[in-house]
Structures are given as C-alpha cells and as structure tokens.
Amino acid sequence: MSTNNALRVFWKSREWNMKTSTFDSDEDILLLPKRKRFRKKKSRPVRHTKRHEEEQVYEQGTTLPCSICKHEIDLTGIFLHKKQHVALATLGFQWMGRKKPQPSVIAVQRQFMISKLLSSFMFTEKTLQSINNAFELLWKKQIPAYYKIFDNIDRSVIYSQKICHLLIKGVGICEDRNSTWKADMNDKFTVVSNFGNKPNVCFFGLFDGHHGASAAELTSMELPVLLLHQLSKFDPSYQMTTDEQQIINSFYTVFREEYAAIEDLFSAINKTEAVRCEYEDTHKAFAKAFWRMDRLLGLGRKEVSRVQWSGCSAVTCILEGKPKSPYAHKNWKRKNTHDGLAESSPSQEMPKIISGILHVANTGNVQAVLCRNGKGFCLTKEHTTRNTNERRRILQNGAVISSNEPYGLVEGQVKTTRGLGFHGNLKLKKSIIPAPQTISVPIDDLCQFLIVATNGLWEVLDKEEVTALAMTTFHMYKETYCPIIPNKSPSKGPLLFSTSEPNLTKSQSNIHVLFQYKSVSEVRVSTTNSKENLSDSNYSKYCIYNPENVETFPAETTHRKPCSEKVTDRPTSVNDVATNEKESDTKSFYEGAAEYVSHELVNAALLAGSRDNITVMVIFLNGSEYQLLT
C-alpha cells in the first residue's frame, strides 16, 4: 500500500444529533432533543472531563479505504461491507461502486443461480445455502447497534512497557475480552527487556489461546526461557541465571537422551547443506524451543478437561539492536515474493545502514506486520484452513476439514492448522503441528513501527487497513494530545514521502529477508510420537531441533502491569540536564503514542465487528521519528 493510500484514512464528524450524556438508558437519550435547557450548560464537573473527551472521540467516525473496492468505508460498517462483497460475488454480481442492486434484480439473479445450479452436476445443499444466505444479506437492510459497541469499548485495558533499546521509541499493549462474544480472556503476552542479559536485545511474545487460557499462559512464561536456552548453546553472549538453569534441569526427565539424540541427528543433517546462512542457528533455536514447549504442554498441567485440552497460536520476536555500521562488504540480491517481501541473496547491494535484526517465528493465526516507509509487510504466515498449502497438508495427513463457513474447521474443532498444545484430542493433535514459520529481516531507519496482534484484529481488518489506521491515529495523537513536540534534528528528512519520488529506489520501498525457513506443505507427521515426528525428513527441514531446557523469566520480564489509559503529559524532573529532559520527553511521547494507537486499533476492531479476544501490541521504532516532521 502506498503512502498516499495510508493517509486516506481520515476522521469526520457524524451528524448523529447526539450530545455528550451520562444517561443510563436509551429512553433518556431519545428525549434529549426536546430538553433545550441542556444547551445552556457551560461547564462540567472535573470528574467527567476524561469521560467527556472519550465520548467526543467516539462521536467522530473513522473511515478507511476498503482493501477490495478502495471506497471510503466507515469502521462501523466495514464488517458488513466486506460480507456484501462476498455475497455479491456468490450471486455473480460485479461490484458497481456504492450502488447495490435493486431487490427485484437480486431476486431474479437468485432464481437464475439456483436454476443453473440444479441443471448442473455441482448441486450441493451447502452451495444452495450459500446462495440463500447471500440473498438474505443483500435483501435486508442492516442497522448497526452502536450502543452495544460503545459499552464494550470502555472495557479495554492498556499496559505500559518500559523498554531500554536503541531501536525502540515506545511500546504499548491494549487488550479487550470482547465481552459481547467471549466470556473469558485467553490472550497472553510477554515482553522481556535485555533478553539473555544482553543490552539492546528484546523479546516480544503474543499468544492466542484456544479452548481455554492454560496453554497460552504456560507458553507465555516458559517459551522465552526455552528459546534463551537454545540460543545460549551456540551464542555464549546469551546468559542464563542460576534459577533459570534449575528450571531447565527440572525438565530433564521430559527430554531424555534419545529425544536429544534425534534432534542432534537432524541438526547435523541440516548443517551439511551447501548454502548456510548466518542466522540459521537462530531459526533452529526457535524451532527447537517450539517443539519443546509443545512437548511440555503434553504433560497436561493446569488442564481441567478430560476431553479437550487447550492450545494456542503463538508469535515470538527477537529484536537485536546493533550500532549503525555500513554493510558495504556484503551484497544482496533482491527477489520479490508473493507477500511483497524481498528475499536477499548475494548479488545486488542492499541498504548500507542496518541498525538491527528482527527475528520472527509464528504458528497459528497471530500475525505481525512491519511498517516500513509507510508500507505494511506481513512477517508471519497464516496457519489456518484458509491457507491452501495448509489445507493440502491436513487432508494428505488423513484429517477431516468440516464444511463450516467460511473455510471449515480441522476435525470440526478449530480453524488453526499449527499451534502449541491441543493434546487432549489425539486425532486433532495429529494434524496440528508445532512447526513455526521463521524469518529474519533487517531493521533500519526507514522502519516505523511493528504491530503484533491476535486474530481478533485480523479477522476484520487486513494489513493495509491496519497500517493506514495506525499511521493516521499516530498523527492524531501528535496533533491532539501533544501539540508541543521536542525539536528534532533538521538533518533528518521526512519518512512519509511519496514512493514515486526519484530519491527512493524500488529496493528501498521493500524489506529484505535475510533468512527464512520455507514451509513445506507435504508434511505428514503425527505429533503424538516424538520419535516418529523427528525422524520424518520433510519435517526436520524446518522444525526439529535439540530442546532440553526450560527457564523462568528474568527480572526484566514484564507481565501485565496496567497503566492509565491515557499517557499524554509526563513532565521530567527540573534537576535534569536539558538533553536528558529532551530524551525523557521524547520517550514519554512515544510511549503514550504506542498506548494510544494500540487502544484505537482495538476500538477499531470492536467497531468493525470482531468476535474474538483482541490484543494489540504496538512497537514504535526509530523510523517513526522521521514521521513527526511530515
């Protein structure tokens, strides 16, 4: 998505004739226009000021371009709008701008589609039901229930994260249970600063629980320690504490010698490959840690059901910061993939300034999007029945995908095809594998922010819409809440310039993949037997390695420390030096901005009709500093 499209998201006032109110019932609101004496109010108690500001924000309507038709759509109607796209396609209509076909035309087209279906050999009850559902959707007039959405929005919780990292300006996390649709909150997250006792190395993890929160909770606590143990095996700079090592040793009986021997065997096979990357060991560490975590979840700790144990989707990120140095001695060949990423191999020169490396591993439907130069890049793979490669693997493995809309469920249970846990159902576990998709990308001064979110956000908004909305809300925060921003160095140019400018090469508008394990769709492995799993040559290609330990979190680990929902003004001490005050003000600004953007993305997902738990993590990088100058 170009920068111009990103800035097309705008806020406009709604003509709702709604006044700021603290009434408890809808009846009082309906009588409001007749009670003219309320117009004479000029002041409001101080205790209502914050609530008044929030209601003013919600009285504004946010619109963003639909990723399908590019028309400006109100957030409250985007869920229905996308369903209408599907319904029109089902009935064979072409999109006609904002005009919807007349009811008589819709009825005639329905009869035509049914007649055509009956005369063919493709007739099924499911296809007939899809046609009828599309007809009902286009025939009826939908009226959104705003009052329900407003009540739900007020329940979001924001967490503040203090991070000391040369690449990170601020981190904010917001979550919402989405009480309209979900009774429990199954999302968990983890943030570890100075990961492995290394400065400028941070760990971020987000875990979306399925059938309960037990698996997600255990994974959020133990997976970072498992990963640290694997990294410390080949990189001594990653250090473990005594307590962490003791916890690792406590799982010795879970990972016996034969288990480690099989992992070492396939690790050695991979090492004989002709082409080897600098970050291959890091990717193997991710794979081993995921496999070991899955094995630990098989112990059934904290599980209460005898039939269906919990599982989780997971995304883990390690951000390594390095002093800026030219990479003139390395050349890279750029090759675009279908995701818009640029694979790198020796040949063509890549940007000479790289300030860090981001390693990402994911299983399931938790996604991470990196915004670079105003364009969003998805760094994760969606492991659900929507993915054709995953569907093929599931079916070839002998599993059944139900006929549930829109893409079916694995064994009629879940739509995720990879994840951690799910051990209670042996038939289901045979198909859901813990094999992570891993990737490493460079982080430079053009990288603005990283958004990591659970399925609750991505089921209603795609990466282009999320990126555009995040950039817009960041500008809103700057203009509305922080009118006075510390002066930035004039030597830094604006980041949000048009991608058509001559000073921006095509290679600079993409990101370069330093290393990536490719998913193999022909995986046919059962995860119930560790020896069989690890001995499969196809599977060892990307996911099996020597895990042997578990650790507890170091002191820098952050676990759900709530903060105030709005952090807009954090004055520094008068005794500080001027430069320290400037740095502190800048840090406070970005921390508040990250919290604000994460909160607005959660609200947008609720308004757009999300039906799942929502957790959004926003990480502002150095590139966001350039954005302030636009």
Curated annotation (Swiss-Prot):
Superkingdom to which the source organism belongs: Eukaryota
Residue ranges annotated for the PPM-type phosphatase domain, each copy included: 170-621
Where is the segment annotated Disordered? 557-578
Show the PANTHER family listed in the entry: PROTEIN PHOSPHATASE 2C (PTHR13832), PROTEIN PHOSPHATASE 2C-LIKE DOMAIN-CONTAINING PROTEIN 1 (PTHR13832:SF837)
Q: Which organism is it from?
A: Homo sapiens (Human)
Species lineage: Eukaryota, Metazoa, Chordata, Craniata, Vertebrata
Example GO CC term: the record gives: nucleus
Composition bias (Basic and acidic residues) maps to 557-569
Known InterPro entries for this protein? PP2C, PPM-type-like_dom_sf, PPM-type_phosphatase-like_dom
Protein name (database record): Protein phosphatase 2C-like domain-containing protein 1
**Which terms does the UniProt entry file under GO BP?**
negative regulation of MAPK cascade; signal transduction
Q: Which SMART domains match?
A: PP2Cc
Q: Which family does it belong to?
A: Belongs to the PP2C family.
Q: Spell out the molecular function terms from Gene Ontology.
A: protein serine/threonine phosphatase activity
Instruction: Please name the Pfam families in this protein's record.
Output: PP2C
